[in-house]
């Protein structure tokens, strides 16, 4: 078992934290806004650890669902499950175990948060299979990656206000943007095996679609900042995030694989500076 531990870590992408960070930033945004900038440390710990665990569970489920496809894609052919180093039942057992630990984390929280967690698990578990049916499965991914937003509001306020759903919508647009750039890396392989992705659906309009999704996401955050009367630290963070999106355009415009992958990874900075703006606004109490 100990000898297989490194394989399990690779299965759940512990060597690639970018996915966890892309989940974490929107969740932290929601925690800070829901609590007026003063979230309980215990809540921050619960949601941060829960984000890591559920992302890891999602990776295991994704590799199980895609095991017959991944062997035909150069980038994924050597994943532990695809290459036969881990059995299918092991991936399922790991995913279930991580999901159960995540649920144990939220046991001290209110009933609404627990109810929403059931929806979150369902969305996370079904996302990998959406790539067979939906033309833009990245939108479904945005819901899965952003469900920490309504859960955070539920945990703090015991309700999910409209602003939480607006933030979830923004996360859907953001996910379509960064995951389309990611899908551009594998587009040729995905076309051969019949996988459906937004990069394939958008076709020659892929770069335009990505930039429009960035614009929609940033536009929602303009509305959010105005509605909550945020001060200059927030807008500085927003401007930095907008700058990141422009930088991403310079990376993806020629559709070069490694540059598209770099744009995907750089979204960590976009999410980070936006959260920094929110946190700084509350920390400095600027109105």
Swiss-Prot record:
Reaction equation(s) it catalyzes: all-trans-octaprenyl diphosphate + 4-hydroxybenzoate = 4-hydroxy-3-(all-trans-octaprenyl)benzoate + diphosphate
Pfam assignment, any one: UbiA
Membrane-crossing residue ranges in chain numbering: 30-50, 92-112, 133-153, 158-178, 207-227, 232-252, 266-286
Bilayer topology: Multi-pass membrane protein
Name of the protein described by the UniProt record: 4-hydroxybenzoate octaprenyltransferase
Source species: Burkholderia pseudomallei (strain 668)
Family label: Belongs to the UbiA prenyltransferase family.
Function text: Catalyzes the prenylation of para-hydroxybenzoate (PHB) with an all-trans polyprenyl group. Mediates the second step in the final reaction sequence of ubiquinone-8 (UQ-8) biosynthesis, which is the condensation of the polyisoprenoid side chain with PHB, generating the first membrane-bound Q intermediate 3-octaprenyl-4-hydroxybenzoate.
Cellular compartment(s): Cell inner membrane
Any Gene Ontology CC annotation: plasma membrane
InterPro entries, per the entry: HB_polyprenyltransferase-like, Prenyltransferase, UbiA_prenyltransferase, UbiA_prenylTrfase_CS, UbiA_sf
Enzyme Commission code: 2.5.1.39
MF (Gene Ontology): 4-hydroxybenzoate polyprenyltransferase activity
Key words, A-Z: Cell inner membrane, Cell membrane, Magnesium, Membrane, Transferase, Transmembrane, Transmembrane helix, Ubiquinone biosynthesis
Cited Gene3D superfamilies: UbiA prenyltransferase
Gene Ontology annotations of biological process type: ubiquinone biosynthetic process
Pathway involvement of the protein, from the record: Cofactor biosynthesis; ubiquinone biosynthesis
Domain of life assignment: Bacteria
Cofactor(s) demanded: Mg(2+)
């Amino acid at each position: 078992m100990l000898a297989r531990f490194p394989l399990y870590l690779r299965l759940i992408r512990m060597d690639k934290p970018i996915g966890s960070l892309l989940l974490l930033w929107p969740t932290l945004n929601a925690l800070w806004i829901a609590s007026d900038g003063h979230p309980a440390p215990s809540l921050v710990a619960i949601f941060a650890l829960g984000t890591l665990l559920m992302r890891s569970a999602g990776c295991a489920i994704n590799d199980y669902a895609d095991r017959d496809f991944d062997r035909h894609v150069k980038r994924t052919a050597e994943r532990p499950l695809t290459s036969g180093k881990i059995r299918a039942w092991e991936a399922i057992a790991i995913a279930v175990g991580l999901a159960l630990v995540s649920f144990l984390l939220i046991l001290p929280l209110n009933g609404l948060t627990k109810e929403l967690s059931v929806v979150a698990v369902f969305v996370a578990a079904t996302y990998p299979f959406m790539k067979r049916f939906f033309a833009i499965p990245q939108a479904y991914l945005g819901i899965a990656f952003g469900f920490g937003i309504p859960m955070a509001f539920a945990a703090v306020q015991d309700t999910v206000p409209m602003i939480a759903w607006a933030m979830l919508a923004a996360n859907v647009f953001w996910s379509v943007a960064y995951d389309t750039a990611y899908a551009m890396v594998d587009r040729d392989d995905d076309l051969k095996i019949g996988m459906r992705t937004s990069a394939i659906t958008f076709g020659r309009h892929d770069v335009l679609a990505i930039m429009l999704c960035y614009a929609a996401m940033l536009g929602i955050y303009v509305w959010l900042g105005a509605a909550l009367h945020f001060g200059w630290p927030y807008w500085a963070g927003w401007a930095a995030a907008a700058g990141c999106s422009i930088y991403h355009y310079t990376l993806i415009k020629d559709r070069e694989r490694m540059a598209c992958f770099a744009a995907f990874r750089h979204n960590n900075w976009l999410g980070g500076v936006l959260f920094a703006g929110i946190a700084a606004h509350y920390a400095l109490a600027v109105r």
